[in-house]
Amino acid sequence: MEEAFGQGNTNVIDEVLHSEFVCYDPNSESGEIRGADTIKGEIEYFRNAVPDLTYTVEDQVAEGDKVVTRYTTRGTHQREFFGVAGTGNRVEFTGIQIDRFDKSGKMVEEWPEYDLLGAMRQMGAIPEAQQPGS
């Protein structure tokens, strides 16, 4: 996924994902993103909004058929992203995901959590929180 998100090489998606792949993304309309083509579309959407997007794996832990990845995404918000027109603001947000793999090494399921609120604040869509007493 680092190559797909960070470099825009969505061809690796077909090599990595199982044909019945499901991503349980709480930020998607239905809560689920199914299939390689849909994931490719999501990556293209992110990279269109943030063309200089980087995706850095900070840490990974594997146990059994699951891998947990902690990552940081950085870039410049140039085009519409989650309803927010491009601002030119630098955006950096972190995330963590749990991926489950089958015996052949294909990713079958994913449960991501990422700091969309922080990204929206950096884009200027949501005001920064005020400290009590300020």
PLM regions with names:
Residues 1-134:
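C-terminal and inter-domain tail/linker signature
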